[in-house]
Swiss-Prot record:
It is a multi-pass membrane protein. GO terms for cellular component: plasma membrane. Belongs to the anion channel-forming bestrophin (TC 1.A.46) family. GO terms for molecular function: chloride channel activity. The chain crosses the membrane at residues 28-48, 50-70, 213-233, 239-259. Keywords: Cell membrane, Ion transport, Membrane, Transmembrane, Transmembrane helix, Transport. It is found in: Cell membrane. It comes from Ralstonia nicotianae (strain ATCC BAA-1114 / GMI1000) (Ralstonia solanacearum). This is Voltage-dependent anion channel-forming protein RSc3414.
Length: 306
């Protein structure tokens, strides 16, 4: 996730890190070369050519802009829904920690509360690895008791295994008489909300935008940008490469941004900063029981949070 202070309008023009321009440079160079070919064909090799009007390109460009707008909106909806789900995860984790501290009839043993908070703090890390399909071993082994760690690693769905343990913790406190029925109901409501968060994230990961829709827009963008110089060369001559590259940047950048944020749990610069948010959630619940901060592990690296 790109996190930068508000930039002056001129510095914004020169921003490089976090922009999609670096990955587009080879493609824009290709459009530049095609523009030179169009100029050479028009001026030197085929002085008598069929003049292409810019009208068809204008109509196609308008339609393509509308399609790209729909694509970007669909991608941003997925991105924003993912961010709201992780915000809800933070709220639920804080609520459950507060309940563990305030709802029991008598104050629970510090070790019991600390174990509960440790497992709750490990949940976002387990979810992050589940969504990114990475190995959670290092993160979970440092946060979970050995028996629970082995149990979680043996499960296919590690966040669900941690949720099961949290439910068992509530059941055990209820059997001991520390929690009454209303307190158990309050815990269960937040556990249900956490389950909805996990399920919502898994839904986003397992349901991409329709491939046929994405490939249709992708092909149209690149065919349009490759053909555009041949439609402009008659009217603007030597300025064809400049305008062709600029128009290509506008269309290709929109498509590249949509492709990045379509999968919000990835590791590209404009994806959600799940590492940072996992540490933030863990730090938030630790703070409620007086545990020290995790430190500045989540500091931005060249304005990029991962």
């Amino acid at each position: 996730m790109v996190v930068r202070p508000h930039l002056h309008w001129f510095r914004m023009l020169l921003a490089w890190r976090g922009s999609v321009l670096p990955q587009l440079l080879p493609r824009l160079f290709l459009i530049f070369c095609i523009s030179l070919v169009a100029m050479a064909v028009h001026v030197h090799w085929l002085p008598i050519t069929v003049n292409l009007s810019t009208t068809p390109f204008s109509l196609i460009g308008i339609a393509l802009a509308v399609f790209l707008g729909f694509r970007n909106n669909a991608s941003y909806d997925r991105y924003w829904e993912a961010r709201k789900l992780w915000g809800q995860l933070l709220n639920d984790a804080r609520s459950m920690t507060r309940q563990a501290l305030t709802l029991p009839r008598e104050t629970l043993a510090a070790a019991d509360v600390r174990e509960f908070v440790q497992v709750l703090g490990a949940l976002p890390h387990a979810l992050r690895h589940q969504l990114r399909r990475t190995d959670p071993r290092d993160d979970l082994s440092a946060r979970l008791p050995a028996p629970l760690f082995e149990r979680v690693m043996a499960s296919r769905y590690r966040p669900a295994a941690l949720m099961l343990w949290l439910g068992e913790w509530v059941r055990q406190r209820s059997r001991e008489g520390s929690l009454d029925a209303w307190a158990v109901l309050a815990f269960d409501r937040n556990l249900g909300s956490l389950s909805n968060v996990i399920g919502g994230c898994e839904r986003i990961v397992s349901t991409p935008l329709p491939f046929a829709y994405s490939v249709m827009i992708h092909r149209t963008v690149y065919f349009f940008c490759a053909a555009l110089p041949f439609g402009l060369v008659e009217s603007i001559g030597n300025f064809t490469p400049v305008f062709s590259v600029f128009v290509a940047y506008a269309f290709m950048a929109h498509e590249a941004i949509a492709a990045q944020i379509e999968e919000p749990f990835g590791t590209e610069d404009n994806d959600l900063a799940l590492n940072t948010m996992s540490l933030m959630i863990e730090d938030a619940v630790r703070d409620l029981i007086g545990e020290p901060s995790l430190g500045d592990e989540a500091a931005a690296r060249a304005f990029i949070l991962d």
